[in-house]
Amino acid sequence: MCFMVIDVVTDEIVESNFEYKHHAELFIEVHGKDYPNAELIVESA
């Protein structure tokens, strides 16, 4: 499984290829100010 962070307004991928959900959630928490519309999605491999 691969976790990605996308901007829900523009549908652009902010960051991808997180192996663990926790890492993607931390990215959103740390960079939330820079990406206020960021959301975690799961991509099946």
Roles of regions detected by a PLM:
Residues 1-19, 23-30:
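N-terminal acidic leader/helix
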Residues 13, 29-45:
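Short, mixed-charge low-complexity intrinsically disordered segments
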